[in-house]
Design a protein with these regions (language model features):
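H-loop/switch region of ABC-family ATPase nucleotide-binding domains
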Residues: 65-67
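A short, surface-exposed alpha-helical micro-motif characterized by mixed small hydrophobic
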Residues: 72-74
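Conserved ABC ATPase signature
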Residues: 5-9, 13
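Walker B catalytic motif
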Residues: 5, 32-36, 42
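A short, proline-enriched helix->beta-strand linker immediately N-terminal to the Walker B motif
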Residues: 23-28
Length: 146
């Protein structure tokens, strides 16, 4: 990337440069909005690991807005769950741990997730499958010990 002019960079390349510049600036709090924008799936995982490692090792705080479920799962320690109707009547609840927050969010959507045993990524269970029904009965909508 360093050998290219900024004007010639792709969206994903620009995003990686922007993330590098953001984390290269000294701060006590990092506000990062949609770090997954323009990144492919492998780059999203890589970026998540880099961001998380940077925040942990620098002992800083980051507030990250992310709508990509997998990336949010990799990044989050705590989540803010919103309820209600977006842009009309929504409530932001107090931050909770990742597992609690994801369970609250997914219960509202009536969706269950498991962790893929080969790559450990989140996978949606088929609606009304045995696994889906077992997890719902146990109140475990997100990554249930497998």
């Amino acid at each position: 990337l360093m050998d290219n002019d900024v004007i010639n960079l792709s969206g994903g390349e620009l995003q990686r440069v922007a993330l590098t510049l953001c984390m290269g600036a000294p701060a006590d709090l990092y506000l990062i909005d949609e770090p997954s924008a323009y990144l492919d799936s492998e780059q999203r995982i890589w970026a998540s690991k880099v961001i998380k490692r940077f925040i942990i090792h620098s002992k800083k705080t980051a507030f990250i807005v992310e709508h990509d479920f997998i990336m949010a799962s990799y990044l989050a320690d705590r989540v803010v769950v919103y309820t209600g109707v977006p842009a009309l009547d929504a409530t932001a609840h107090a931050p909770v741990g990742l597992l609690t927050g994801m369970n609250q969010f997914l219960k509202h959507l009536e969706i269950t997730f498991r962790r893929d045993p080969t790559n450990y990524r989140p996978r949606i269970n088929k609606m009304h499958s045995v696994k889906d029904e077992e997890q719902k009965a146990a109140g475990e909508y997100y990554y249930c010990g497998d």
